[in-house]
């Protein structure tokens, strides 16, 4: 008589443990978004109806990378489970106005459906991204696009910018695999649109730029803007300049 009773108790214990484990499962919102918007404050919606059940020890995450050039804004966003990490909210402004602006936000959290941000307003101040005055001397090709820019009009730069930037961001992770081409006005020196930060939440970012001399204009004494000639350009011009130099000497 004792043995069946013990078996019943064991079954109840197993069922209880199973119910307890299922009650501790972590559920996260899941979704991806890659878009370019002219009015992200009103047009971008970060809500999703998909749900993901996480493995043991995982967290929920929501991560977004925002890149603004001129009047266009590229947005790459991901929500879902993350296998490891620490609970934290991280906001980084990689490139500040005036000119090109890059901001990232990531939230790692431990409660079900805690990755529930639905808009950009909580960490992106749209009123601060518009320049009030522009330069009359510095103009730069300006665009941001997923993949490649098919049009990059030369636009007057905001006061406070000193050079033109051109580069490409290769982004992988968090379900995202994409490249973003960026051109525009900036005050930063070199290929540092991401300020040297290579990881944004589960996303890894690789920044690549063409020859930096081609993206660093300077102003002449009369206020005009010119581009330095790279070394290979001088090598091409030298044979043309030598005969004139010999003739006048």
Swiss-Prot record:
Post-translational modification: N-glycosylated; by high mannose and/or biantennary complex and/or certain types of hybrid oligosaccharides; possesses different oligosaccharides chains according to its subcellular localization in the testis. Sheds from membrane raft by ACE and released from the cell surface of epididymal sperm while it passes through the caput epididymis leading to disappearance of TEX101 on spermatozoa; is essential to produce fertile spermatozoa.
Prosegment residue ranges: 223-249
Keyword Signal among record annotations: yes
UniProt keyword Signal present: yes
Tissue-by-tissue expression: Detected in testis and spermatogonia. Not detected in spermatocytes. Detected in blood leukocytes.
Major subcellular site: membrane
Superkingdom in the source lineage: Eukaryota
One GO CC term on file: extracellular region
Lipid-binding residues (covalent, GPI-anchor amidated asparagine): 222
GO terms (BP aspect): binding of sperm to zona pellucida; fertilization; flagellated sperm motility; regulation of flagellated sperm motility
Biological role: Plays a role in fertilization by controlling binding of sperm to zona pellucida and migration of spermatozoa into the oviduct. May play a role in signal transduction and promote protein tyrosine phosphorylation.
Protein name per the record: Testis-expressed protein 101
Organism per entry: Homo sapiens (Human)
């Amino acid at each position: 008589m004792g043995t069946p009773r013990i078996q019943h108790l064991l079954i109840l214990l197993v069922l209880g443990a199973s119910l307890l484990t299922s009650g501790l499962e972590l559920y996260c919102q899941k979704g991806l978004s890659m878009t370019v918007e002219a009015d992200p404050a009103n047009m971008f919606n970060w809500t999703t109806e998909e749900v993901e059940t996480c493995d043991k020890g995982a967290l929920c995450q929501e991560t977004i990378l925002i890149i603004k050039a001129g009047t266009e804004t590229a947005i790459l966003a991901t929500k879902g489970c993350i296998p490891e990490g620490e609970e934290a909210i991280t906001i980084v402004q990689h490139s500040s106005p005036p000119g090109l602006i890059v901001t990232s936000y990531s939230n790692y959290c431990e409660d079900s459906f805690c990755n529930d941000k639905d808009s950009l307003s909580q960490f992106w101040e749209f009123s601060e991204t518009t320049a009030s005055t522009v330069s009359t001397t510095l103009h730069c090709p300006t665009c941001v696009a997923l993949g490649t820019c098919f049009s990059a009009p030369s636009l007057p730069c905001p006061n406070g910018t000193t050079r033109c930037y051109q580069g490409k961001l290769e982004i992988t992770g968090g379900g995202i695999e994409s490249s973003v081409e960026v051109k525009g006005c900036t005050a930063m020196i070199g290929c540092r649109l991401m300020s040297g930060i290579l990881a944004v939440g589960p996303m890894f970012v690789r920044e690549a730029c063409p020859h930096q001399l081609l993206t660093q204009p300077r102003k002449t004494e009369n206020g005009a803007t010119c581009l330095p000639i790279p070394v290979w350009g001088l090598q091409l011009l030298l044979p043309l300049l030598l005969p004139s130099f010999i003739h006048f000497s």
